Amino acid sequence: QIYPGGNFEYHLLPFKEAIKNNLKVIMPYYGIPVGQTDEDVAMAFNSYILKDLLREELNYDGVICSDWGIITGRHWGVDELSIEQRYEKSIKAGIDQYGGEKDTDYLIDLVKDGQITEVRINESVRRILLNKFELGLFDNPYVNEELVQYKVNTQDNIEAGLEAQRKSIVLLENNGILPLKKGSKIFVDGLSEEEAREFGELVKDPDDADAVIMYIHTVFNGNQESGLNRAFDNFLSTLFPNGDLNFNKEINKKIEAYSNEKKLIVVVDLNRPAILKSIKESSSGLIGTFGVQDRIIFEGLFGEFNPSGKLPFEIPSSMESVLNQKEDLPDDSANPTYEFGYGISY
C-alpha cells in the first residue's frame, strides 16, 4: 500500500470514527504500508500500526484479529521468518486472534520458551472473552427458534430491502429510449426471461425487438495468480477479479452486434468500477446496478420507479488513466467517463 498523494492520515478517518463508536474488532489488512513506518512489513506484523497507532494514538482496546492465513499463506514482508517467528512477531506487534490459522503448538512452545509471556496471552484472552460476555454467550448461548419468524425475513424487512435495491440503481445514459412502455417487444440477454415476460413481449430475434436489453456482470478478466501452492489460495484466485477494468473481446463484440439499430440498453453490474466508454457510445440506455434482483431492474426499465441512485465512485475513461492516478486519492483519474456522484433520472 503506497501513499503518493500523502493521504495516509485521510485513510484513518473511518477508523477513528468507528473506534469512537465502541468498535469491538479490527482486522488489519494484508498489505505493507510502504514508507509509513520504521519497517516495511504487513500490518499484522507491524508494531507501529497495531501498538503505536491503534492502541496508543487512537486509544483502541478491542480485539485485533488477523486477516486469513497471515502465518502460513500471505505473510508479506516477513517471508524469510519461520512459522514460529511469524507467530512471535505478530503477537508482539499486537495481534489478539488469528484468522484461518489453527496450529496452537507454536504458541505453546513460544510461551514455554519464554519468548511470549502468559501476561501477554492473557491480554488477548481478556479482550476476546469480554466480547463474548457482553453478547451474553455464556449466560444464554441459544437462539429462541420461535422468535426467528418474527425477526428474520419479515415482510417489512423484505420491503425495505427491495426499496434499497430500487434506490441504488444509477441511470447513466438515456437517449430517449427509457422508460420502456409496458408490453414493448424486448430481446433479453443475461436477465431472467420469466421476469421479463411480466413487463414486455419477449422475442427471440433482436431485430424484431423494440429494445435489446443486455446485462453484463462485474468485469472479470481472468484469474489473478495466487503465487502460492495452496488449495485455498488457488480457490480464492478464482473468486476475485484482476486489475484490468476493460470488458473482454467477446462481450464487446456482442455489444457491437446488438447496437447496430440504436435500441440497445446495457445494464452493467458495478460491484467494482469498469471501463464503460465504448459501451456508452454503443448504447441508447446505460444503467449501473449493485447486485439487485432482475425484477427490480425490469421495474426500473419500465418506469415503475424513477432511478435516483448516484455513483459511489468515478468511472474511469481508460486503464491508462487508472494507472496514472495516485493510489491513495479517490476520484482523481483524468477525464473520467462519469464522475463520483453522477446519476440522472427520467
Name these PLM-found stretches.
Residues 118-140:
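Mid-to-C-terminal alpha-helical segments outside catalytic/metal-binding sites
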Residues 24, 96, 116, 134-138, ...:
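Intrinsically disordered or highly flexible coil/loop and linker segments, enriched in small
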Residues 1-100, 104-109, 117-120, 127:
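Second-shell residues forming the walls of enzyme active-site clefts
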Residues 147-156:
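Short glycine/proline- and acidic residue-enriched helix-loop micro-motifs
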Residues 138-147, 217:
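Flexible hinge/switch segments at interdomain interfaces of large molecular machines
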Residues 21-24, 59-61, 93, 125, ...:
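Short coil/turn connectors at secondary-structure junctions
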Residues 15, 60, 138, 203-206:
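Aromatic-residue hotspot detector
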Residues 29, 40, 74-75, 105-116, ...:
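C-terminal non-catalytic regions of proteins with extracellular/luminal or membrane-system context
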